């Protein structure tokens, strides 16, 4: 069976050296690659009732020409041909762009078959193909492949047809019969045939469902097997602490815990008291109380006789966290120390000696914590805040400071559940999805750029009451390519307008980290009242006095990033405001502004952002670790993702999966991916 799987594509008639080279560039090397090279779209020539067709979907209809065609020219070579078409009892508009010759083919009352994109709102079809006469039954659903250079779509169809005939029915099916039957999925051969040569929409739908599930299952199996291997290979620290002592500390806090904080805390302390190493992601919106949860977890480590570490991305954030922890542990005989690059000389030497002697219970700091000379006596808990801001190697180095300490990653970036279980699938995920009572909602408004004078008047009104403001711009300097505001121009403009009244600061990514810290210190101390910045303040410090956030060209940002920026205000007792300045051209841009104005819930926004931008853009283009699926879509197929995750967990935990022949193909996939070694899989 495997021989066919790895048979070279050169065995297919018509594939010579040049064609083989082109196919290799498309990632097609053997028969298996060829058969799993699925169409990127299907041209559906099957007649359908327009009532069933979704907006923007491609459709084929047969109808009578109901009006004389009208040809309109605009520009030198551009034109539009429009006519009315009676399809059953629907009277719709058909539009053809830049094909004036079609006018001669159309006559009032004649029957035509048209295919194109359906605009449900305008009851208009944008014609891509038009043929005189009734619909031809022999052409229903045609696959369209992504091709290049000397390989055409027709050639690709021919190559795949040969592969289906000669090899497909002898290839091993990755999905065991038991799983296929439980979800009523077709076998491998049937599914391949339906993907490449669908006879009906229903057959195609079923085949797609099978491959969606298969892709998700394989991915989740790798994740679950990785977790299993980690647990078996790394013996964690079983932390033993008194629940009564921990409850005494919790009751001493100046605020009651929310139900969500209590739930998350139970998950974390259960991990800490187990013999396995904790590897958990803690998600919580800005202001949801992650720091309090972190403090309680750190205290549990101290009660167990160990030390804890908290690593954050910036020096000023480290200082604020350290101050906050010192305040919380004031009456509890807990030693908190701060280590950043600013701690030098004798002070640094003394701190490191105390740390190695076990005299420091909690060490807070930046990447300075991972330097070689930093040694703990007994580190059992590592917490990193805004974990995606650190590289994998940095996180690994900190983890290696102890004997497999428990690790908790915290992020204020609300990550949709579908992405969290995919991108962070090897971790357990905890979510604080509830805000503390009494927290004021940030009022958010979407305005056009021509309202700048009114906005600045509103900003000044707030400044006169002793408040401060952030002004965010998408760029640092002027750009020829983008017509958007830049921070330097806005800084110069505001410095002129408010000269002698208010101090204006400037922060952007080109500043050295020391310079950024200095600017933020001045803003925190209210030495400057207006801070003009790029998105470098997205994850920043706590300035309770800042109550206004003005974002220029807000439609340039995704919802999640806008929400992170908005989270810089609303941290004190005063009412806060976020003003989105934007003149969006696209419907998606307008939709983003509307959603931002209506909701303050970060998780709801992150789900919407995922829908509008897609998974690839959610973390930014350069984000590594995002899996690429051929068929599956994490947003639209999230139910299948959940099912596959549960099935993968059950399989990996069962003896049958590692021994029974029916799971051999799935085990081979794990072996190929390098997640498990051959000994375990044999």
UniProtKB/Swiss-Prot annotation:
Effects seen without this gene: Decreased viability with a cell proliferation defect and an increase in anucleate cells, very sensitive to DNA damaging agents 4-nitroquinoline-1-oxide, methylmethane sulfonate and mitomycin C. RecD2 is synthetically lethal with recG.
Cellular component annotations (GO), alphabetically ordered: cytoplasm; nucleoid
A GO biological process held by the record: DNA recombination
Residues annotated as binding ATP: 284-291
Annotated region (Wedge domain), positions in chain: 46-139
Catalytic activity: Couples ATP hydrolysis with the unwinding of duplex DNA by translocating in the 3'-5' direction; ATP + H2O = ADP + phosphate + H(+)
Motif DEAH box mapped to chain: 385-388
PROSITE patterns cross-referenced by the UniProt entry: HELICASE_ATP_BIND_1, HELICASE_CTER
EC annotation from Swiss-Prot or TrEMBL: 5.6.2.4
Coiled coil, from the record: none
Keywords: ATP-binding, Cytoplasm, DNA damage, DNA recombination, DNA repair, DNA-binding, Helicase, Hydrolase, Isomerase, Nucleotide-binding
Stored SUPFAM superfamilies: Nucleic acid-binding proteins (SSF50249), P-loop containing nucleoside triphosphate hydrolases (SSF52540)
Catalytic EC class: isomerase
Predominant place of localization: cytoplasm
Domain named Helicase C-terminal: residues: 451-611
Domain (Helicase ATP-binding) ranges: 271-432
Subcellular location: Cytoplasm, Nucleoid
Regulation: Replication fork regression on Holliday junctions (HJ) is inhibited by DisA; DisA inhibits the ATPase activity of RecG.
Single GO term (MF): four-way junction DNA binding
Pfam hit, one: RecG_dom3_C
Family: Belongs to the helicase family. RecG subfamily.
Subunit and partners: Monomer. Interacts with SSB (sbbA), via the latter's 6 C-terminal residues. Colocalizes with DNA pol III subunit gamma/tau (dnaX).
Physiological role: Critical role in recombination and DNA repair. Helps process Holliday junction intermediates to mature products by catalyzing branch migration. Has a DNA unwinding activity characteristic of a DNA helicase with 3'-5' polarity. Unwinds branched duplex DNA (Y-DNA), Holliday junction (HJ) DNA and partially replicated forks as well as catalyzing fork reversal/regression. Does not seem to unwind R-loops. Inhibits the diadenylate cyclase (DAC) activity of DisA in the presence but not absence of HJ DNA, possibly by relocating DisA from the junction.
Protein name as catalogued: ATP-dependent DNA helicase RecG
């Amino acid at each position: 069976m495997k021989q066919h799987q790895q048979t070279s594509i050169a065995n297919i008639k018509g594939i010579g050296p040049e064609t083989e080279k082109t196919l290799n560039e498309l990632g097609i090397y053997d028969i298996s690659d060829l058969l799993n090279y699925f169409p990127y779209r299907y041209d559906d020539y099957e007649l359908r009732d327009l009532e069933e067709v979704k907006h923007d979907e491609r459709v084929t209809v047969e109808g009578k020409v109901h009006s004389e065609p009208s040809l309109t020219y605009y520009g030198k070579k551009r034109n539009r041909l429009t006519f009315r078409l009676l399809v059953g009892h629907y009277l719709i508009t058909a539009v053809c762009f830049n094909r004036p010759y079609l006018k001669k083919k159309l006559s009032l009352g004649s029957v035509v078959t048209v295919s194109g994109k359906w605009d449900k709102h305008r009851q208009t079809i944008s014609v891509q193909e038009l043929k005189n006469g009734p619909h031809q039954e022999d052409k229903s659903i045609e696959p369209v492949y992504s091709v290049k250079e000397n390989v055409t779509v027709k050639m690709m169809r021919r190559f795949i047809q040969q592969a289906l005939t000669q090899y497909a029915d002898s290839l091993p099916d990755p999905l065991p019969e038991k799983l296929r039957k439980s979800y009523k999925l077709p076998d491998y051969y049937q599914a391949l045939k339906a993907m490449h040569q669908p006879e009906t929409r229903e057959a195609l739908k079923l085949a797609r469902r099978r491959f969606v599930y298969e892709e998700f299952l394989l991915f989740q199996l790798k994740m679950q097997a990785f977790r299993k291997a980690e647990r078996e290979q790394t013996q964690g620290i079983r932390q033993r602490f008194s629940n009564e002592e921990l409850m005494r500390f919790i009751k001493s806090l100046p605020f009651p815990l929310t139900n969500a904080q209590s739930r998350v805390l139970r998950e974390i302390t259960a991990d800490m008291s187990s013999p396995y190493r904790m590897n958990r992601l803690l998600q919580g919106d800005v202001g949801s109380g992650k720091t309090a949860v972190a403090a309680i977890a750190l205290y549990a480590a101290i009660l167990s006789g160990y030390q804890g570490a908290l690593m954050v991305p910036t020096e000023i954030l480290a200082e604020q966290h350290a101050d906050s922890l010192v305040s919380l542990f004031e009456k509890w005989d807990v030693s908190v120390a701060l280590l950043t690059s600013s701690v030098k000389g004798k002070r640094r030497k003394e701190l490191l000696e105390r740390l190695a002697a076990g005299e420091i219970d909690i060490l807070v700091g930046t990447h300075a914590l991972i330097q070689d000379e930093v040694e703990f006596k007994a580190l059992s808990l590592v917490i990193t805040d805004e974990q995606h801001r650190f590289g994998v190697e940095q996180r690994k180095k900190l983890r290696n400071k102890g004997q497999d300490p428990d690790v908790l990653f915290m992020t204020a970036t609300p990550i949709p559940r579908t992405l969290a279980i995919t991108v962070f699938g090897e971790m357990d995920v905890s979510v604080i999805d509830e805000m503390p009572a009494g927290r004021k909602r940030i009022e958010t408004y979407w305005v056009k750029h021509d309202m700048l004078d009114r906005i600045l008047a509103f900003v000044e009104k707030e400044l006169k009451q002793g408040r401060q403001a952030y002004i965010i711009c998408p760029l640092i300097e002027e750009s020829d390519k983008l017509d958007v505001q830049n921070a330097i121009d806005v800084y110069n403009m505001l410095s002129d307008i408010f000269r002698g009244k208010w101090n204006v600061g400037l922060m952007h990514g080109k500043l050295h980290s020391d310079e950024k810290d200095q600017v933020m210190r001045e803003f925190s101390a209210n030495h400057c009242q207006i801070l003009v910045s790029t998105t470098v303040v997205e994850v920043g410090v706590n300035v309770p006095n800042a109550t206004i956030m003005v974002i220029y060209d807000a439609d340039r940002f995704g919802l999640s990033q806008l929400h992170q920026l908005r989270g810089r205000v609303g941290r004190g007792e005063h009412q806060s405001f976020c003003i989105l300045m934007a003149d969006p051209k696209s419907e998606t841009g307008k939709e983003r502004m509307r959603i931002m104005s209506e909701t303050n819930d970060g998780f709801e926004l992150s789900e919407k952002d995922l829908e509008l931008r897609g998974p690839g853009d959610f973390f930014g283009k350069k984000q590594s670790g995002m899996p690429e699926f051929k068929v599956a879509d994490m947003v639209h197929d999230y139910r299948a993702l959940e099912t596959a995750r549960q099935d993968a967990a059950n399989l990996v935990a069962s003896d049958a999966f590692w021994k029974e022949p029916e799971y051999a193909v799935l085990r081979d996939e794990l072996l190929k991916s390098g997640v498990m070694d051959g000994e375990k899989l044999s």
